[in-house]
Amino acid sequence: MRIEEELKLDYSDVLFRPKRSTLSSRKDVNLNRTYKFKYSNQEWSGIPIMAANMDGVGELSLAEGLSDFDMITCLTKQHDVKKIKKFKKIKYFYKNIALSIGI
């Protein structure tokens, strides 16, 4: 057995100080961001929050719902390509899905 004697930090050792803001409400915050990808020269605009494959998250129905808010859904590699292509509104939210392949 190995005993580690180094000092370890805990949650009680960390303090986050909020930044001062001129906003009167959290509803006034704009979460939309635009990213330009260096090597493809493509841009993506939306809210940089991703739903990934965790216990049923990352399904086509979730992608449709999150796309209304310009959020990204990572679909699993188990999805059949034919099923993705046949999904009715795929063109509407296609820019907000990513395929995870698990390399």
Task: Label every PLM stretch briefly.
Residues 1-103:
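Active-site entrance/lid segments in N-terminal catalytic domains of soluble metabolic enzymes
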